[in-house]
C-alpha cells in the first residue's frame, strides 16, 4: 500500500518533470527558429546588396576589371555561405571565410578608412559555430566604431583556446562607447524584447549561441570611449 503510493507519487513527479522539460525544449526550439529566421531576413539586406552592386558598376566603369572580378567573387561567397543549404551550424573555418568575404567587399568600398586582420589559429578551425555569428559583429564594428572616427580604422579578428573552449575576439579601434551606452548594449543583449535595431543584431547572435550550446556560451562586450570596442565570442568543444 504505502510503497505503491510512494512509487506512484514519484512516477507522477517524474512525468510532470519530463513534461516540463519537453515544454522547455519546445519553447527553446521555437525561439531558435525565430532567431534564425530573423537573422536570414537581415542577411538579405537590400542596402548592402545595392551598395555593393553600385560599387561593382562604378569599378567596371572605371575599367578596374581585377577589382570587379574580386568583388563579384566575394559577394558570391558571402551569399553562398549565408544561404548554406539550410545548415545552421558551420565550422569556424567556413564562418571565417564568410566574414572575410564581407570584409573584402567593405574594404573595397571603404578603402580610405578600413583595414582588417584575421588571425585565428588552425586548431580552432573544426570548432562549431552558429552560421553568421561573426559578420554582424564586424558590421557593428564598422558602422558604429570605424565610420564614426577620424582617420583609418582597424578591425581585428583573433582566436585562442581557453581550456577546451574556443574564444574569438572582434576588436576595433573605433569610437568606442560611453559607460552608459555600454550598459545599455549589455542589457539589450540579454533582453528578448529589445527594440533597438543596432542592439538586436548582437542579441540575435548571443541568443543563437546560447540556444545551441547552453547558457555558459555567447558574447560579452567591453568598450572604452575614444579607444574602441571588443566583442568576445565563447564556444564549446562540440
At which residue positions do the language-model features occur?
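Two-component histidine phosphotransfer core
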Residues: 1-222, 228-232
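C-terminal beta-strand of the catalytic ATP-binding
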Residues: 233-238
